[in-house]
UniProtKB/Swiss-Prot annotation:
Biological processes per GO annotation: translation
Species the sequence originates in: Clostridium novyi (strain NT)
Keywords from the named record: Ribonucleoprotein, Ribosomal protein
GO molecular function: structural constituent of ribosome
NCBIfam families the record matches: L29
Entry protein name: Large ribosomal subunit protein uL29
Protein family according to the UniProt entry: Belongs to the universal ribosomal protein uL29 family.
Disulfide bonds: none
Length: 70
């Protein structure tokens, strides 16, 4: 994700981020399935999706910590 996409994610609610996380996990599952069957065209996409999942999880955790501090 680009920096501006990350800024857009930070504005989203926790529910929207959870939905995005579920979508990314489903995409990762499909990519891994394609890899196993030899149909994956762009193996770099797996790395990108995993990084996006980590970024969304980080933003969710930041929001959790912000709520705890208040």
């Amino acid at each position: 994700m680009r920096a501006n996409e990350l800024q857009e994610l930070r504005v989203n609610t926790a529910q929207e981020l959870s939905a995005k996380l579920n979508d990314l996990k489903a995409e990762l599952f499909n990519l891994r399935f394609q890899l196993a069957t030899g149909q994956l065209e762009n193996p770099m996409r797996i790395r990108q999706v995993k990084k996006s999942i980590a970024q969304v999880k980080t933003i969710l955790r930041e929001k959790e910590l912000k709520v705890i501090e208040q």
